[in-house]
Curated annotation (Swiss-Prot):
Gene it is expressed from: GDCSH
GO biological-process terms attached to the record: glycine decarboxylation via glycine cleavage system
CDD domains hit by this protein: GCS_H
Protein family: Belongs to the GcvH family.
Signal sequence extent: none
Cofactor(s) annotated in UniProt: (R)-lipoate
Record function comment: The glycine cleavage system catalyzes the degradation of glycine. The H protein shuttles the methylamine group of glycine from the P protein to the T protein.
Protein name: Glycine cleavage system H protein, mitochondrial
Organism: Flaveria anomala (Yellowtops)
Transmembrane segments: none
Extent of the transit peptide: 1-31
Length: 162
């Protein structure tokens, strides 16, 4: 795993934890966007649940604080993830941060494009920059995640505290 270096208290606080092209309009924020229709973890991962599959990635807010992403460490398909535990890492020019899963389940697909083009997380965090797709083992875990308005408020409060 990549060498851990924490460049700022904000990056240190990020615990990062995947979706196919959501077609929602973003809520306006001063430097990042939050999409309506997704669920968000306080560790700055998003989840899009469609049918039996949930896609997971890191939020625009998280990638904005990390800066240019230069490397992504992801697990293999067929493995499993547990809610609130790490499944990979994102290395940027500023820091390396763990990526946590907001839900538990079996990994059914990994975004292999990220190994060649990790910057997709910066340019398209909610579309091309998704990380993993999971078959949730406990779909009720989604109920504990935040909606867009809640997550926007959470980010504003977190940023104000730093």
């Amino acid at each position: 795993m990549a060498l851990r270096m924490w460049a700022s208290s904000t990056a240190n606080a990020l615990r990062l934890s995947s979706a196919t092209r959501p077609h929602f309009s973003p809520l306006s924020r001063c430097f990042s966007s939050v999409l309506d229709g997704l669920k968000y973890a306080n560790s700055h991962e998003w989840v899009k649940h469609e049918g039996s599959v949930a896609t997971i990635g890191i939020t625009d807010h998280a990638q904005d604080h990390l800066g240019e992403v230069v490397f992504v460490d992801l697990p293999e398909a067929g493995g499993s993830v547990t809610k609130a535990t790490g499944f990979g890492a994102v290395e940027s020019v500023k820091a390396t941060s763990d990526v946590n899963s907001p839900i538990s389940g079996e990994i059914v697909e990994v975004n292999s494009k990220l190994s060649e083009t990790p910057g997709l997380i910066n340019s398209s965090p909610y579309e091309d920059g998704w990380m993993i797709k999971v078959k949730p083992s406990n779909p009720s875990e989604l109920d504990s995640l935040m909606g867009a308005k809640e997550y926007t408020k959470f980010c504003e409060e977190e940023d104000a505290a730093h």
